[in-house]
Amino acid sequence: MKVPFTWKVTGWFMIGWSAEIAIGEVRPLRYFGQDLVAYRDEAGELHVLSGHCRHLGAHIGHGGTVVGDCVECPFHGWRWGPDGTNRYIPYQPERPNKALRLRVYPVREQYGCVFAWHQPGGEQPQWELPDLFHKFPQFPTDPDAYYRPYPEFSSRAER
């Protein structure tokens, strides 16, 4: 009998702090048993994609660079857009490979935290990231006004 759901994790998961990824920065990540790459484009938008270039498999998070809204693979310079599409190939700049895509992980930033959506089949979010401070109005909405239970993480989140 096939169950109508997966036993694998599905939902929004905190994957870091907003302050950890500056504009133009590329970071390797490992979550959900997958290598990922996080980058903040030149406009300040944060993106998370599958970590390996579809050209020859280099990990984009190790040495990759941001060019506009794309992340560039350090191996041969292929560029991948925030929608996962191949946008540029150095030796054929007018003809990117539109058949190749990287998996895109939807990302939200809330109160200095970075959350990524994971669903094993790659489906889009089934619900929005809840705003816990609005859900529980008796608590202050200032992120500096609440107690962080792990002091070693608090120092990483400071501005």
Describe these PLM feature segments.
Residues 58-67:
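The serine-hydrolase catalytic nucleophile loop
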Residues 1-46, 68, 79-159:
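Rieske [2Fe-2S] iron-sulfur-binding subdomain
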Residues 50:
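A glycine-rich beta-to-alpha transition motif near the start of alpha/beta enzyme domains, typified by
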Residues 53, 73:
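Short cysteine-rich clusters marking metal-coordination/redox-active sites
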Residues 56-59, 79:
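Cys/His-rich metal-chelating microdomains
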